[in-house]
Amino acid sequence: MAAAVGDSRVSAGKKLKISLRKKRMKMVVASVASELEDKDKDASDNEGSLGSCGLEKDHFSSGDEAVEADNEDEAEPREDDNDSAAEATAGANAGWADAMARILSKKIPESKPTILVRNKELEKEKEKLKQERLEKRKQLDKKREWEMMCRVKPDVVKDKETERNLQRIATRGVVQLFNAVQKHQKNVDEKVKEAGGSIRKRAKLISSVSKKDFISVLRGMDGSASEKNSAGKNSKAKQTEAKSEEGPGWTILRDDFMMGASMKDWDKESDGPDGSRLGCGSDSDT
């Protein structure tokens, strides 16, 4: 745009110069013509028709010279205009080429697309990256759901009783573990005392002690606890069996209800607690 504005200004200045030259030439021609007319008038009075013919020839010759001068002046600026226009176009093309070369030679960051082709490629790459991230997030969400499927956060306020039971179980387990450790240590100390002061026997005893011994002691503790629990359960079961062996107060609840009675005497069966038959029918007959 700046080059075009400069070219227009140059052409306008040249046109003004040409117009001023033309005006000057016209003024010169007019002054020469007026002088010739004055001379013609003077010569006409003295010489006559011959002088007038010569003046006409001079007038025409001067006019032709003026026209030729104008044509030459017009031809010269036209050539100058053509040369200046060619130079201006060449300069504009060179400037445009330089600007494009600078733009293309610049190292542009990927985040700022300046060319449409690069912009499209970057958009495609960004879409691919977004899809990959979404797929990874979906896979991670699935894994978390699978891991957290059976996990439930306990509510301490609502599950107070369950928490207390768990605490009791934990305390029992810890107490049992420490008791087993203490018992195992006592057993080892007793065996060492029995061995006496011999170092070999002590070394053999210490080497013979293994994890299995401790686990057996721990299992023995578990067995004793389980035996106690089983004994308590057996006593409770026996009590329930004794209660069940006792006959119910109502005869309908017995297992042998209506097993020995005949169907004809069904209306004579009493609903009393003693199970005796009432002879209502016989009394009424008598």
From Swiss-Prot:
Keywords assigned: Acetylation, Citrullination, Coiled coil, Isopeptide bond, Phosphoprotein, Ubl conjugation
Coiled-coil residue windows: 112-148
Post-translational events: Citrullinated by PADI4.
Chain positions with Citrulline modification: 9
Residue spans crossing the bilayer: none
Modified residues (Phosphoserine): 11, 62, 210, 270, 284
Residues annotated with N-acetylalanine modification: 2
A GO biological process held by the record: maturation of LSU-rRNA
Compositional bias segments (type: Acidic residues): 65-84
Name of this chain's protein: RRP15-like protein
Organism: Bos taurus
